[in-house]
Amino acid sequence: MTSKADTPINAENGGVITKKDLVRMFWRSLPMEFSWHYERQMHMGFEFMIGPALKKIYKDDPEGLKEALHRNLEFFNCTAHVSPFIGGITLAMEEINRANDDFDASSINAVKAALMGPLSGIGDSLILGTLRVLAVGIGTSLAVKGNILGPILFFLIFNVPTFILRYVCAIKGYELGANYLEKVQASGLMEKFMLAAAILGVMVIGGMTNELVVAKTALKIGSGK
């Protein structure tokens, strides 16, 4: 007997991803930042997170799997704790790409780029800028007095909510992608949706380039005397 965790969530539309696959993605999101580097930042961590699910989606299509793995090695940078949300949406779009020859695969990276900025803004401010500071404050105030509860409370206050958030993001990201994108495609609005995502993605990458890339030239433009 097949358990609910082994039943494809979007089976009615030909999907193959199960809840067990998403739970596995959740666990594989934990080392997201282990391979961070300046060129593409978290792209290898993102690939590691969704890799097994991609192999399942393109099980009988080696060339499609190769393209999907290459496609998802593009630049990626987002608060690690909410990255499974983007991973879930990406898997939903990869399933659509696998089933529909007319689907524009480049839109997958456009949607990823469009989501990185807004989710990072929320994640950095709430998780790293608020929850982490709160956990450090409580933990440190006890630790300086020699109370063993200091590091324990820091560990629990910061990690329990973020673990739950990662899990919820993995599940809800895929469900949103599977349900919403199928409806958008059926309504004929997919092209407009992808155009909007591409424009937003270019804006996000442009803003990040402005912040991260520094170029100096010998040419100086003066004003006045």
Where are these regions (language model features)?
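Glycine-centered flexibility motif
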Residues: 45, 85-94, 117, 121-124, ...
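Transmembrane alpha-helical segments and their cytosolic interface motifs
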Residues: 106-141
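Soluble N-terminal domains of membrane-associated systems
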Residues: 1-104
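Cytosolic juxtamembrane amphipathic/interface segments immediately preceding
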Residues: 28-33, 70-75, 107-120, 182-187
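The structured alpha-helical core of multi-pass membrane proteins
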Residues: 76, 125-129, 159
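Hydrophobic alpha-helical transmembrane segments of multi-pass membrane proteins
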Residues: 37, 122-126, 196
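Hydrophobic, membrane-facing alpha-helical anchors
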Residues: 101-115, 213-224
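Membrane-embedded alpha-helical modules
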Residues: 130-134, 141-225
